[in-house]
Each structure stands twice: as C-alpha cells, then as structure tokens.
C-alpha cells in the first residue's frame, strides 16, 4: 500500500470523503488521490516521494510556479511581523493599488478570503444597489458554492453529475434564472419578461468549469449592453481568469478593446499568490454601497490578512509581461501537441482555449455551452488521466476543469509532458463505456 493510500484511508475516517474539496477525491477518474507533501517550480512531490509535472498549479494561483523565491521571501517577512491583526494594514492598500492600476474597470476594491465570498458579496451588493432580487446566471458557469448560484453549475457539480446542491431552498433557487451560455437571444428574452426585476447578470469572463469555453464574439459586450439598457448590473467573475490569462485578466484581453465595461468584477486565485485571498471591485458608486458607509453588509475576520496580502503583492509585481508571454507560448505549444497526439490515434476531440487556459473534450468537435460539454465522451478521460499520471504528469482529476501552466514550466518539464501524450492518447482511444 502506498503512503497516499494510507493517508487517504485515514483521511476518510476524519473528513467527509477524505477531502476538503470534492474534486480532490479522484471521484470521476478513480484510483487513489495523491497526497502532496511539497512543490517547487513546475513540480509536485507526493507522500511516496514521486514527483510530477504539475498542470493544475493549485487551480490557477501558481502562475509563477510553486515556491517562487520572491513570493516566499515576502511571506517570510510578513510572518515575522505577525500573522493576523484584525485591523487595517499598509499591505491592503498596496495590493489594492496594484489591482486598480492593472484593471481600469475597478475604481474601488474590497478584499475577502475566498472566491465564493467575492461572488456572494457581489450578488448581495447588486441586489442592494438596484433594489431588485433576480439574478441571471449561465448553465455550466461556476461561481463558488453560493446557494443562489449552484443551479446548473460546472466544476465539481459537473464532475459529480449533480444538477444542483441539496440544502438550497426552493425560494433561493427561484430567484436565479439559468440560461444557456453564449446565447444572447435567450438573455434578451428573459429581460423582456423580467427586466424590471433583474438585479444582475453574472458570468465567468471565460468559463473554465465546464471545460474551457471561449465566449462567442460579442457575447460579453452584448451582456454589458443589455444590462445597461435595463438598469441591471453585469458581474464579471474573474476569480480564475483574473491576472492568470493576462496582466488585466480576461477583460483586459477583450473588453477594453471592444469598448465594454462590467459594473463589478470578482478576483481570486492569482491575486492571493497561493494564499486564501479574493476580492471584488468595480464602479465606485456601486462599491460605496458596502458597509461601513453603505447599507450592504460584508465583513470578515481574515479579510485583507497581512500574510496573504504580502503574497499577492509579490506575485503581481513578479507577474510581468514576459511571464504572460512565456505562459501563453507554452500553452499554445502544449495544446497543439495534445491535439496532434489525439489525432494520431483517431480520437475525435476539441482542444478548448481561452487566453492561456485550455482543456480537452472528447467525442465532440466544439464546446460552446454546458449542453455541448455534457455531450462529450467523458469515459475517455480517466484512462487518459491515469496514463499521464503514470508518466509523471499531474492533470486535473476531472475533464471539466482547465489545464494550467506556469512560468516555471521549462523545456525539461514540457518534454516530459510531450513524451507522455502518445501513450495517453492510445489509452483514450481504447477506452470503452
């Protein structure tokens, strides 16, 4: 028995499912979850001492690679000054200045501890600001485990084939209108009926929790126009894409040049440099509705934690244009190699891209929405995953999650991935239901 198996068996005696986040249990791919003891650069090391090239990157935060020396030094210095004060610190202002300097759509910023808190607060703020109750979301878009946003969510719910979550009341669910992604006509129709009651539309800037799905040309801009016409707000969820796909997130890649601006944005992952930090920001007049001077309450003991702020500041300072250029180039290189390997084995597939994020869908030619994502041949992913794992490459343990690269993925790391792809493609081709 491996050390990971022993640890997992013990963990199941202590924690639900043996994990603290469902996808880690390897439920959709089978086998034993790897218990990670350390990470450095592009590599993870498990409890059995085996190393893996990491294509999860902590689900996005490790843009620079694991244990980046500048981030570690900043965290050490912050720890020496104290772990938590329950008071404001200079580091909060420094990180806020960096975010506002990168994302012109953000005029005010509020720090929280998780992406779920950020989206939950953004929804509450939209309702408070507009005086309306209804929220529009899109099937397959994941916005954390907020009660009102769990309907037809992607990520772990897609992995577990769950339509929603038990414990969400009918009254809560009734205030969420779920539409197909990339369908502006459906948005226009729902506003024609409910426009005066809709507080906000929330969407992932580029969905990455039903696999990666790029918004159709004009889709996000259309959402901005429709919400503005009806006095509703547009909430752009950049928890995953923010500062990961570019210096200003996905909106910086597309929205600024297309001439549309969201009212609120949410951030997480990279903004905390690997520590529990997230944020929401946007129009000053909307953000000022938050307490202490506004009527919409939000608070958190660990919001703006000084150690997390230090990690975020160090990460954003180190995330230069060269870093994004390098990650973009590696992403294009790997997605092309993945497609070639699958084509060589005659496996129908679609490599889905948005910025430097990508994923693979089996048995379909394109994924534009959640219905397409669910129609793929998911049974091919588990053998593909385990073949890569056996070759020392750690992929997301779900076909519905994005693949991530970092600035630490050098030629040696990339060559290990390339060498593993042909066998994994053969395993996918041989898979049966």
Curated annotation (Swiss-Prot):
It is an enzyme of class 5 (isomerase). CDD domains: OAT_like. Transmembrane segments: none annotated. It catalyses: (S)-4-amino-5-oxopentanoate = 5-aminolevulinate. Its EC number is 5.4.3.8. Pfam families: Aminotran_3. The modification N6-(pyridoxal phosphate)lysine is found at residue 269. It is found in: Cytoplasm. Keywords: Cytoplasm, Isomerase, Porphyrin biosynthesis, Pyridoxal phosphate. Its main location: cytoplasm. GO terms for molecular function: glutamate-1-semialdehyde 2,1-aminomutase activity; pyridoxal phosphate binding; transaminase activity. Pathway: Porphyrin-containing compound metabolism; protoporphyrin-IX biosynthesis; 5-aminolevulinate from L-glutamyl-tRNA(Glu): step 2/2. One of its GO terms (biological process) is protoporphyrinogen IX biosynthetic process. It comes from the Bacteria. GO terms for cellular component: cytoplasm. InterPro entries: 4pyrrol_synth_GluAld_NH2Trfase (IPR004639), Aminotrans_3 (IPR005814), Aminotrans_3_PPA_site (IPR049704), PyrdxlP-dep_Trfase (IPR015424), PyrdxlP-dep_Trfase_major (IPR015421), PyrdxlP-dep_Trfase_small (IPR015422). Its cofactor is pyridoxal 5'-phosphate. NCBIfam families: hemL (TIGR00713), PRK00062.1 (NF000818). Homodimer. Belongs to the class-III pyridoxal-phosphate-dependent aminotransferase family. HemL subfamily. This is Glutamate-1-semialdehyde 2,1-aminomutase.
């Amino acid at each position: 028995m491996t050390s990971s198996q022993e640890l997992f068996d013990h963990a199941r005696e202590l924690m639900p499912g043996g994990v603290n986040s469902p996808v880690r249990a390897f439920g959709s791919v089978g086998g034993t979850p790897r218990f990670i003891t350390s990470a450095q650069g592009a590599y993870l090391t498990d409890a059995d001492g085996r190393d893996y090239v990491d294509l999860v990157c902590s689900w996005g935060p490790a843009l620079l690679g694991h244990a980046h020396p500048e981030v570690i030094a900043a965290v050490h210095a912050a720890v020496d000054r104290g772990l938590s004060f329950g008071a404001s610190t200079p580091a909060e202002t420094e990180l806020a200045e960096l975010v506002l300097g990168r994302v012109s759509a953000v005029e005010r910023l509020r720090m929280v501890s998780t992406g779920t808190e950020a989206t939950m607060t953004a929804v509450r703020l939209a309702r408070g600001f507009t005086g309306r109750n209804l929220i529009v979301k899109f099937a397959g878009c994941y916005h954390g485990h907020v009660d009102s946003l769990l309907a037809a969510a992607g990520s772990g719910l897609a992995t577990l084939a769950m339509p929603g979550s038990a414990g969400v009341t009918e009254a809560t669910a009734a205030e969420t209108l779920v539409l197909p992604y990339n369908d502006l006509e459906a948005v226009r129709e729902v506003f024609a009926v409910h426009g005066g009651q809709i507080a906000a539309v929330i969407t992932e800037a580029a969905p990455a929790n039903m696999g990666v799905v790029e918004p159709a040309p004009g889709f996000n801009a259309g959402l901005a126009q429709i919400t503005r016409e009806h006095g509703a707000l547009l909430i752009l969820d950049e928890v995953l894409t923010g500062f990961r796909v570019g210096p200003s997130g996905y909106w910086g890649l597309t929205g600024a040049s297309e001439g549309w601006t969201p009212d609120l944005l949410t951030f997480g992952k990279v903004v905390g440099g690997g520590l529990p930090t997230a944020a929401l920001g946007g129009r000053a007049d909307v953000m000022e509705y938050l307490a202490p001077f506004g009527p919409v309450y939000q608070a958190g003991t660990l919001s703006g934690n000084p150690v997390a702020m230090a990690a975020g500041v160090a990460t954003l300072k180190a995330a230069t244009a060269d870093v994004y250029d390098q990650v973009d180039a590696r992403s294009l290189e790997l997605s092309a190699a993945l497609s070639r390997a699958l084509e060589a084995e005659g496996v129908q597939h679609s490599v889905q891209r948005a910025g430097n994020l990508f994923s693979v869908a089996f048995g379909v030619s394109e994924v534009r929405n959640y219905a397409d994502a669910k129609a793929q041949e998911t049974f091919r992913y588990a053998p593909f995953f385990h073949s890569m794992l056996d070759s020392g490459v750690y992929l997301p343990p779900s076909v519905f999650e994005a693949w991530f690269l970092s600035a630490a993925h050098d030629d040696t790391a990339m060559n290990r991935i390339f060498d593993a792809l042909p066998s994994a493609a053969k395993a996918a081709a041989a898979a049966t239901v």
